[in-house]
Amino acid sequence: MRSGNLTDWGFMKAKTIWALTDGKAGMINQARGLASAIAREMGGKVVEKLVVPQTPWSFLPAGFWPPGISGAGYGSDDIGAPWPEIVVSCGRHAIGPAVWIKRKNEGRTAIVHAQNPRTATRQFNLVVAQSHDALKGANVIIVQGSMHDITDGSLSAARQKWSDKFVGLPRPLVAVLIGGSNKTYRMTADVTRQMADDLLRMKAANACGLLVTASRRTGKENWMILRDMLSQPDVYFWDGDGDNPYQAFLAIADAFLVSADSVNMVSEACFTGKPVYILPLEGGAGTKFERFHLEMRDAGHTKTFVGD
């Protein structure tokens, strides 16, 4: 059985490692985090590369993409020689370009894919997949939760930068990390109102402060509901302007409430070692998300938020 050392998988020392994604934040964070971890072992400079799909390819499964990088459009980076020794790809739209890069470099570029590629794993030198995907293969390494670029150093820097901003908020300080609807979960206006009401009751019962951030998936209507209902004393609601305080929330908060739709945010909150509670949304039954949450609860990493 091979160890976790990349040399045991046939990898050579690297000068350059490309972190290749379609530009979505969740994909970038995973590719960056995995590429940085590889660089610490194998050497090399991490360079982030974007291959942003143009219409109509952005709406189609990765298998329908044209060959190589011909489906990449506005916002994409230049993809050409000199080629890297290692490509870390993440997301379905990065698979075709990663395989094309390896072919252009006559097999001298190794591909490490983060997440379940939903295609033949033999195309990659290594696949690092999450346990709830239940993926198997000779070149598959399984991890619990998603990979990310959060480190002790980045949290320390964020704490130093932002600590004065939240000094007036009471302790304990609870960070609320809210995503939104996806293919599995629905975050309706009614669910959002109930969520905000539960947060306020929890705040009153525990005399705590709240740090709240939402995402693009939250949607405008839900975002406005949260903003209006949570405009209360001892609540910091990030409105999206200026620098993103997300890592500061991770560094400074004493506990976390995270909406069920985001494996990434749950995994990043768990990295801190602080209590993490999951905010339920409509949906999820019988899906890989449900498997993920069961695994995390069974391992003692998370609990379900019940309103207090």
Q: Where are the model-predicted features located?
A:
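Conserved catalytic-core segment of nucleotide-activated headgroup transferases in glycan assembly
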Residues: 181-214
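A donor-sugar binding/catalytic signature common to diverse glycosyltransferases
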Residues: 24-27, 246-289
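Active-site and donor-binding regions of nucleotide-sugar-utilizing enzymes
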Residues: 19-20, 24-142, 148
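A nucleotide-sugar donor-handling region in carbohydrate enzymes
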Residues: 121-188, 305-308
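Extreme N-terminal starter segment of soluble prokaryotic enzymes
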Residues: 13-18
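Catalytic donor nucleotide-activated moiety binding site of glycosyltransferases and closely related
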Residues: 207-242
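Leloir-type glycosyltransferase catalytic cores
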Residues: 293-308
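Short internal beta-strands
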Residues: 48-50, 128-129, 209-216, 280
